[in-house]
Amino acid sequence: MNSKAFNTVKTEESTNVWLTPRELLDKLGHFDLDPCASTIRPWDCADINYTKEDNGLIQQWFGRVWCNPPYGSEAYPFLKKFSEYNGPGLMLLFTRTDIKAWHDYIFPTAKYLFFIKGRLKFCRPDGSQKATANAASCLIAWDESEFELLKKLEKEGLGKLAILS
C-alpha cells in the first residue's frame, strides 16, 4: 500500500472529512491549535482553528496541537509537519502501520501510540454520527507531556498505550 492510501476509508458517504467525536475530544483536554479544522464544524477542537483556506501546513504551530487530518492523501503532509513540530499535542489517525509514512514519521520520532479500543464513529460537519469507521484508530504523541493523559485513558479502558523507544 502506498502513502496515498494512508487514511482512505470507503463508506456509503464519499468524503475525506471525518470530524472527531465530541465524546473523545472531551476526554483529551484543552488544545491551543487545530491546524486542519473543518470549515463547517459543530464544535471547535481548539482555541485557534486553521481551515483549508488558512492552510495549516504553512502556518506556525504552537502550544498543544490537536490534529485529526483530512483522510486520504491529504493526511501525509500533516503527519510530516507534526513529526517535525515535535511539541505537545495529539494526532488521530487510522492504525495502518504498514504504510510507509508510519515508518518515516511515526516509528522513528513519536513517543507514544494509544490504540483506541473498537472503532470510532466519526461525525459529519453537522455533528451527526457517521457509520462506524472500517479501521481502528490511534492517538500519536511526539511529546512526553501526553504520557499521563494517555495512561489515564488506558486505566479508563479506552484503549492500550504503547511506549516507543
PLM feature spans:
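Class I S-adenosyl-L-methionine-dependent methyltransferase catalytic core
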Residues: M1-S165
